[in-house]
């Protein structure tokens, strides 16, 4: 038995709704890693991403809902590849705080996220 175990979480070229991811943006590469905590009952406002991003749910669960109402719930230990260019929001419908680490593959000063109505 090895002392090191590698467990793939995600290996895809599609977002969680099955849409193909766009090409990486031109310009100076910029990688951003964020840690977020969403309390039970809290809802992240409707927004859209201009760059590819993916994350791992460390604790709790998060339901992500697209502007068309398509939704998927991600639980602790699962990877999520976010929608790019499509308005969506996240909501913690669980009973404990959700903790997530998100990785963004951007370029230059491109915004990671923008509000959407």
Which stretches of residues belong to each language-model region?
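A short, N-terminal "cap"/entry segment at the start of jelly-roll beta-barrel domains
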Residues: 1-32, 116-117
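Short acidic-glycine-tyrosine-enriched beta hairpin
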Residues: 38, 68-85
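Histidine-centered catalytic micro-motifs
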Residues: 44-51, 86
